[in-house]
Every structure is written in structure tokens, then in C-alpha cells.
Amino acid sequence: LYGGQQAVALQTNDQLMTAETFDDAIVAYRSGGPVHIRDIGRAIEAPQDTTLGGWLNGKPAILLAVFRTPGANVMSTVEAIKKALPQLRASLPPGINVAIVSDRTQTIAASVADVRFTLLLTIALVIGVIAFFLRKLWATVIPAISIPISIIGTFAVMYVLGYSLDNLSLMALTIAVGFVVDDAIVMVENIVRHIEGGAAPLQAALDGAGEIGFTILSISISLIAVFIPLFLMGGVVGLLFREFAVTVAVSILVSVIVSLTLTPMLCAKLLPAAGHGKEGRVSRALEAFFTWLVHAYDRGLIVALRHRRITLGVMLATMAATGWFFVVIPKGFFPQQDTGLIVGVSEGAPDISPEGMKQRQQAILEIASRDPAVASAVGYIGPGGPTVTENDGRVFITLKPKGQRNVTADQAIARLTKAVEQVQGMRLYMQAAQDITIGSRLSKTQYQFTLVDIDQSELNFYAQKLMAKLQDLPELTAVASDQEAPGRTLAIQIDRPAAALFGITPATIDDTLYDAFGQRHIARIYTALNEYYVILEVNPQYQLGPNALQRIYVLSQNSTMVPLSQIASLSPAVTPIVVNHQGQFPSVTLSFNLAPDATIGAAVSAVQKATRDLHLPPSIATSFQGNAQAFQSSLSTTPPLILAALFAVYIILGMLYESTIHPLTILSTLPSAGLGALVTLLLIGRPLDVIGIIGIILLIGIVKKNGIMLVDVALEEQRDRGLSSEEAIHHACLLRFRPILMTTMCALFGGVPLMLGTGTGSEIRQPLGYAIVGGLLVSQVLTLFTTPVVFIYMDKIGQALSARSRAKPSRLADAMRIAK
């Protein structure tokens, strides 16, 4: 109200704040007296929805799942939440506590810490290899300097690109350690060789850098070319590994710049002249060992060159074996991780009551809590979030740290699955939470297969038949369906003429039923911190069973109460409690986990065969979803991806050498690496998954450097000294034997910590280590003998083609001759 000088605000006590005040509220007047709520019912303080329930270790709880927004850093997000918790706790009433039940960032932090240790261990191992081969302080320090410089330079580029330091980028840096020292090792070894030949350090640095610069450039550019297909790879997998590829490529690029500039300068300034310093006994012993090793290799090389056809046959057999092993090796998607979290879906009968669901869900949580590997078990029931029906619930089981339990997550799932079988009328489907998941479709188990049809009854019929077949497959376990069994329904058939006699419409009947059983929200209570719904329903004791409808009366037009039974009939029926859709059509999704020792490749093939054997009608469309669909996509793109990497390397090498022949010699080193990687994965019982494929692609870049170093020297010997192809490649093999051995050992020791890692998140890194180590071991043994033979044959082919082109006059020459 506004006066001449002042304004006054109006405020009423229109809001009832407690159940007692609602009890005193007047809703009508009858016979001249007021009718209070307490006269016809009662107001109580109670949960908003009694069909819902949540528990933590046996105590009632409200569960809150927090997800970061796209682009947000999960570690900083969780840290901000933890900082806000004390203030939140202070605002809650006594007796209510807020606790973090499951924190995925702890696993992420542990995994990052483990891979950080792996990175440091790799650096130490690589420096040890350099010291073992060069046996001189500064000759060891100079290549080692390239490691931190390359890593720091990579960090700078990652920062500009907005990348974060996570498992994939750290894994990329770990692998890159073996790459970034290669260039410096080759440069230092060549300069040291000139110094030992009598040259001054400065002159040796100039001569050595000029001599080996093109080789280093060829190695690095062709290595970066390997990652071009990864840069262009589409889909979610491509997005995941684009950062990996960029990280490795940038580190290699920085190392090239360091090796061609800083490394020669340091060699000129820090390396002593020949004869300075006295070699120790260990150094002399190592030098004698390397000399013996070179002589032994020389003897073997002479035999290989003498029996060229046999050696070439070995290489061709290696190529054939690589193709055969690629076909027969089991295929996977991503390694199964043990993140310490198990997520589960509990499913009761479609007509189970909320009270029955609560009792069984609590029994499941109690059984899970008693397991020695479990740190906490939390769950809830009722519609909300990913749960859409009252007979479904969710379970989240946090396992103890790996050091405090003697079972993996999958073993814990198997044990818990057997333990909860004692809970009658409930099924529990569990899966180990994974850091990398594709797709947003939620299912009871890990992999999904969807059927879509326009005819719901036909779809349900064939979905049930297919599910029965899938349950018999040995490759699958925990087969589930989102097709809920029909639930009990009480059909209310309104007698419209009878209702019309009383002036009652169907809408009035619907409103009456909603008032009684629908938990109608009729008001809100607002407080300083919260708001509460005022809910209307009949007394819970009058909601038990179909007989409750006998007590329902409907208000007629003349204000008389008419029994519902007088204007409607009741009949029991069954009906689906949920109908799922995909693309606006009815759908059923069958989900499954993998049986022990089964691969997703075998499971997908088994599901496809079972589907074909069922002879589904043409109207039913089928497709894999989520991880299974991404696996199919990655499986189909793997051969083109590898071929694209080979083609990119061939094009780059062809441009560098201005030849179409010699790049083939270099690429001939690759089949043995692929064979080693595939055989290693087979021997340890691992499938060829996305991580293993990345390892094979990396091997393309690593192994071809051996061929580049040999071909470079051989071509130079032919050009400068006029040697035959056999003499040139023989000399090149002996001259480059030590740097080849050094660079291979550095790359190999870069993969060993990944291969042997057992810490948190090691499951996803191990296939990369196994593929690299196995591929390098086999290729190192074979390519040192097969590459020289291939060079000789390719050189002869090149000479023959050159001679033919010289002998055949060009059309222009013919035209000029005719004109004359």
C-alpha cells in the first residue's frame, strides 16, 4: 500500500507449514458445522513417494549421481564438490550425513599415478640401454637430454590444443620415450664413430650430422606418416585415439628438431677426442662382446646372402603367416578393466509390490556387503533415472582396492551372482564399470543386440525365441532383455449409461481414482532451504489389493456418493508394463556379458549365427548397439586402417628416395613385426583388440627404421664407391648393426613396463606393450637377414627397369628423329 510518504507490504499466513495445521484445515461445512481434514482423514509427515527406496550398507539413504558437463575436467569437478561438502553438511539437520560412496576419480588418479611411474621407469630403462651400448658419460647424457626436452615440448603443444594429461596421453608419452631417443642415438653413435676414427669432435659433429641427417629425417617423417590414418579415423574410437596419435607425433617432431640441432652441438662441445680417458674393465668387456656379436652376425649374414632364395622364402612365409594369424586370432574391442566398481540391475516379478521389492533389494545389498572383496554396497528401487518400472532397481558395489582383495571384478561378479540366487523372486544382472564405453543406451548387462519391428506381438514372440537361443550359447552369460514380462492389470470397464444417470463422466471417475491412488500433488510447502509437496491419497491400509476399489465412491452431479462398483465392472488382465522404442518403432534389446575366456568377436559371431538360424521375418531389423556396434565398426575398419598406414609410409618414402622400388625394401621389414605381435597376443591368451591394433600400427613406424638405416648406407656405398648391391648392403648391415640394435632395444624397453604393469588401469595398457615387445623381438631377428636379401632383389629389379626405360626411346625422341 502506498501512502504519501511510505509504502507498506502485505503478507498473509496463507501457507500451512506442518501436518498438525493441515489436520485443522476446514474443507467443507456439513449440517451447519465445519469438516476438518482430521474428521475425514489425517495429515502425516512422510516420504514423498513410498514406492521408492534407497539404502547404503543397510541404512536408508538418498542417492545422488553427479555427472560432469561435456568438456569439464572430471578431477577438478570432483575436487570442487569435495570442497563444497563441509558447507552442505553444516546446512543439514542433525542425524543426516552426506558421504561419498563411489568416487571414480580415485581409480583415475591411481591409474594416472601408475602410468606416471611407468613413464619414469621407461625413461630409466632407455637411459640404461644407451649407457650399456655407448659406455661413455656424455655420449649417454646427450641422447638422454632429448627425452625431457621432447616431453616438455609435447606438453606445450598439448596445452595449446586443450588436451589433458590422462591415461591415453601418458601412455602415448611412455611409448614416445622409445621413439624420441632413436634420432639422438643414431646421431650420437655416428658422431662417436667419426671421433673414434680420429676426427676432432667439431669436425666429427659436422660430418656425422651431414651424413646421417637425411636418414633421421626419413625415419621421423615416415613415422609421423603412420599416424595419418589415426588422425582421420572416424567414430568414437577415432576421437579417443586422435589425442594419442597427436601426442606421439608431436613428441617425434620435437625430437627431430632436437636431434638435428641441439644434439650435434652438444656432441661438438662435450664429447672428448679419441684417446682421452681410460676405458675400464667393464667397458672393454662390453666392447669385446659387441665385437663378437658383430662377427657372429656377419657369419650369419653371409649364410643368408649365400642362400638368398631360402631367405626370401622365409620372408614370404612370414608374410603368409602374418595374414593367417590375423584371420584366426580372436578379436576384441577394449580390454576388460577392473575399475573397482560393479553396477547391477535387480529385477523382480512384474507384479511385485513395492514392499516386496524393498525387502528383496535390501537382502541383495546385505549379501553384497558381506562379501570380503566389497567395500560398500548401495542401491535403490522404483522409477527414477535409468529405472522406468517399479520392479527394477539399481545396485552399485564398490570393491576394496586391489591390494586388499584377492579377486578381480569379474570374479567378484561371478561369486556375487551365485550368492544372490538365494533371494527368491529376484534376478541381479551385474557388470564391471569401464572407463571407456560407447553409446548411451542403458542395459542390464554390457553388450546389446536390438530387434525392431512394426508388429509388437511378432517382435515379442521372436525376441523371446532368440533370447532362449542366446542363453544356450557358451560364449555368453547373464543374457537379459528389456522386454518386461506382462504385469497384472485390473481393467475398469465404465458403464457409461449407468454413470450418465448420476451425471458422472469418465473424467470424474479418472480424477477420483487419481485422487485415491495416484499421489496427486495438491500444494507445495516452501521453507528457507527446501520445498515439500502436499500429496493426496487414501490411507495406505485401503490400497492393499483389488478389494480397495470396493471402498471407492464417486461424487455425482447432485453431490451424492455413488459406489464405483455401481457404475463400473472390474476384470483382471495382463499387459506389458513397458514398451521400448527405437526410431519410433517398437524394439526389444537383448543384452549379455561375455563368458570367461570368451571374446566379443566370438560372441558377436555366435549371436549373428543364432539370429540366422532363427529365420526372422523380413519385417524384423536387427543391429548391435553400444560397445558391440563399435566393435563391429572397428573390425571392419582395421584392415583399411593398416593398409592406409602402409600406403602413407610408402608415399612418404617414395618422395624422400625418389624411387618406387626402395620403399618396398623398407616395408618388407613389417610382416615379421606383425607376426611377432600376433603370436605374442595368442600365446598369452589375449585377443587382438583396438589397443593391440594401435600397437601394430606403431610397429610399422618403429620397425621400418631398420630398413631405412640399411638402405641409406647401401645406396650411399653404391653411389660413392661403386659397390655392387651385395657388397653395399653387406657393408651397411655391419656398419648400422649397433645403432639398429640400440634403437630397437630402446623401443623394446619402452614397451616392457607397459607389458608387465599390474597397477590400476594396467589392463588397458598391457596389450600395447605385448604387441610392441613381441613384434620387435621377432622382427629384429628376421629383418637383419631378410632385408639385405630383399634389397639385392629389389635393386636388380630397379636396374632392369632403368635399363628397359633407357633402351626404349621416348615418343618425343621418335618424333624429333622423324622430323630430321
Question: What role is predicted for each listed range?
Answer:
Residues 101, 108, 112, 188, ...:
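Helix-loop junctions and hydrophobic alpha-helical segments within the transmembrane domains
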Residues 124-193, 200, 232, 250, ...:
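Hydrophobic transmembrane alpha-helices and their membrane-interface caps
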Residues 159, 163, 231-240, 275, ...:
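Transmembrane helices with small-residue packing motifs
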Residues 119-123, 213-214, 276, 302-316, ...:
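Membrane-interface helix starts
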Residues 177-191, 213-232, 239-283, 395, ...:
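Transmembrane alpha-helices and their membrane-interface boundaries in multi-pass membrane transporters
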Residues 212, 281-335, 419-422, 449, ...:
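Signature of alpha-helical transmembrane segments and their immediate interfacial
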Residues 68-72, 78-125, 157, 165, ...:
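Membrane-helix entry/capping segments
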Residues 1, 15-50, 57, 72, ...:
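Surface-exposed amphipathic alpha-helical segments in non-transmembrane regions
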